[in-house]
Design a protein with these regions (language model features):
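Solvent-exposed loop/turn segments at secondary-structure junctions
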Residues: 9, 15-18, 38-40, 49-51, ...
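Append "and occasionally in soluble cytosolic enzymes with long acidic Gly/Pro-rich linkers
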Residues: 33, 52-153
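A generic secondary-structure signal for well-formed alpha-helical elements
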Residues: 9-14, 64-69, 74, 78, ...
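Extracellular/periplasmic solute-recognition and catalytic clefts
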Residues: 1-49, 60, 72, 183-187
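Ligand/substrate-recognition segments at binding pockets and active sites
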Residues: 1, 117-190
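Loop/turn elements at helix/coil->beta-strand transitions in domains of secreted/extracellular proteins
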Residues: 6-8, 27-30, 53-58, 66-68, ...
């Protein structure tokens, strides 16, 4: 619609992907303005699920998530990696925290020490239970699907089977509100919204 002249402007999250933004940045026909970040993209872990109730599993996933690669490879650097939920510019949020470093070897070691041993099919197991985690994403979001597929591949290297499920937006939101997920994408807008 923008390219056909049917609309004058695109604004907001999930309205346009990083590929299109980069295309428009190089175009003489369009002007692109990017604001400072006002939200934080996140993946919420449901700690009431059997597997994710284990702190060591959650920490291992943190170490197995290469936020810089997601920033560079999916967002072309347009979205920077976040190490905290709120920006340091939010009152009382400018605190010293040591972020989890990307380290697949450490992630595997943490899982080994927590009793999650590599089983058949390169999926870890503990007490006969495979390390299967479901990630729910909004099927309308190309970005969320790309991140989900990247994480699925990355987690596979440490023996975690990440099953990704795209759902239309209303179903996605209903399942998120009901807690029917292991992992789910969300956005934190900061004050005054959160």
């Amino acid at each position: 619609a923008l390219e056909k002249g049917e609309i004058d402007m695109i604004f907001g999250k999930n309205m346009i992907d990083a590929d299109a933004i980069n295309q428009y940045l190089d175009s003489d026909k369009f002007t692109v303005e990017l604001s400072d970040p006002t939200s934080t993209r996140q993946i919420v872990l449901n700690t009431s699920s059997d597997i994710l109730s284990e702190k060591d599993v959650r920490i291992a996933l943190q170490h197995a998530t290469n936020k810089q690669n997601i920033s560079d490879g999916i967002f072309y650097g347009l979205e920077k990696p976040a190490d905290t939920l709120f920006a340091s510019t939010v009152p009382y949020c400018d605190i010293e925290l040591e972020p989890y470093v990307y380290d697949l070897e450490l992630a595997g070691q943490i899982l080994d020490e927590a009793g999650w041993k590599m089983g058949s099919g390169n999926v870890r197991e503990k007490d006969g239970q495979p390390l299967n985690i479901d990630l729910l994403y909004n099927s309308d979001s190309v970005t969320e699907k790309s991140i989900a597929e990247y994480l699925q591949s990355e987690y596979q290297t440490i023996g975690v089977a990440l099953n990704i499920h795209g759902e239309e937006e209303q179903s996605y939101r209903d399942n998120m509100k009901a807690g029917n997920f292991d992992m789910v994408f969300n956005i934190c807008w900061g004050t005054p919204y959160d």
